[in-house]
Amino acid sequence: MLNVAGLAFADAGDSLFKNEKLTYDGHLFFNAANSAIQSEKYLLNQQLSNIKMGSELQVTDWNKMKGLLIYNTLPTPVAPQFYFEQFYDELQIESSNIFFAFGKKWLAFGNYKSDLIYKPLTKALGQTNEVAAIIGYDSLYYANASFFKPYSRISTSSLPLYYNLNTGVHNQSMDAGVSYLYSLAESQLFQYNKGFGGLLSQSLKTRVPGFATYFNLKYKKTSTYLTYVTAITPFALEDMSYNNRGASPKALSIQNSYDVNIKKFSFKIIGFYDYTFQALALGIPKQRLGLGLSATPFPYLGIQFQYSRDYSYRNNAIASGINHFVNGRNTKMNNLALQTILN
């Protein structure tokens, strides 16, 4: 079964006014996917959104505001139909590389680069969206710290604000770094998922910090993206379990792409492999591997095709979250997805 979606679109090039300080852009997504891969909407809702509208207002030379509004055709408790994925103010200290940011944005927990329609399972496990206050430094070496009010409280923690730390090194062709998250339960997948439902607004027995590391490299026509996300300690048995023990979810993703040019037509060939560990309760597969093609035949049109094969957890595996049980099914599933993007 194929599901196709499309909605109206507005482009900044046809705007009624233009301003040097205000820029905005939009993306319209037409998606076709078999029923298996369509279920990923629940995991990474924003990836198959039908409309994304981004804007940036340069208030002064040292102050800018950014926003990204998304219209979701399949809303969830963590990503409603009209969803400000990002809306924040950023202050750059003059004559320095120090910045401050305040507002709603993705935390710097991992760096999940991808050339695919469906992003890696490491992103599913680690991406975290919060209303946060951030201080950072950005140059060849970078570091930042984010402070936020959590969605799920930990009964053993008295901290009023939780935090996220990130540091690394980058240039035009490489980005490598490590990240720390005070509570991995703040990730969107832990908050809401297809497995046991999610931890949104729940009180947890124990704190489970998260760790992420990444290495992204582009060399000539080849790109390589490697990411790893893990719980540092196991969850309490009552909060999340795997085979009758506290679960310690992990995910590893490897993606390689190669740019091909045939006369005036260029495209990317992409290969990828994802592996998860003790993540059955979250409703994501044990393994995923596949191939993809990505092309931009016109400046305003992008086309992506992806084939993947999912391997679920074995049928003797059992998991739970907040006393809701999830069983392994030992299935293999082929997934197809096609996406056209109007910019």
Language-model features, listed with the residues they occupy:
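Detector for outer-membrane/organellar transmembrane beta-barrel domains
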Residues: 166-280, 287, 342
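Outer membrane beta-barrel
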Residues: 13-36, 40-153, 158-159, 164-178, ...
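Short acidic/His/Gly/Ser-rich catalytic and metal-binding motifs that mark active-site loops
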Residues: 35, 109-113, 186-190, 235-236, ...
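Extracytoplasmic loops and strand-loop junctions of Gram-negative outer membrane beta-barrel proteins
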Residues: 36-38, 70, 115-118, 194-200, ...
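Outer-membrane beta-barrel "beta-signal"
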Residues: 165, 328-343
